[in-house]
């Protein structure tokens, strides 16, 4: 089965191309192209943890999106969560930049 032209496994919606977001998404993409192949497809979520981190950084910036991606990876594993877990489109005001621990139990 062939994939459509221009297909990307990562989120392709509009996002501001700030230096932090570009750098963060570049690191995630580098991981996807290199280490992900050696580790194998073992993510228990949809979208996968790296796709989630890419979208979170693209939508919410390097600081909030990076924390969201880190917490998602920490949830993924034996005894962790599983299933469909999309990135929220908008972060609520209680998710302030100076309180990243509030992103731990983030629900869309």
From Swiss-Prot:
Keywords annotated in UniProt: Cell inner membrane, Cell membrane, Membrane
UniProt membrane topology term: Peripheral membrane protein
Location in the cell: Cell inner membrane
GO CC entries: plasma membrane
Recorded coiled-coil stretches: none
Principal place of residence: membrane
Matches recorded under InterPro entries: Membr_insert_effic_factor_YidD
One Pfam family here: YidD
Superkingdom of origin: Bacteria
Family as reported in the entry's similarity comment: Belongs to the UPF0161 family.
Function: Could be involved in insertion of integral membrane proteins into the membrane.
Stated name of the protein: Putative membrane protein insertion efficiency factor
Lineage of source species: Bacteria, Pseudomonadati, Pseudomonadota, Alphaproteobacteria, Hyphomicrobiales
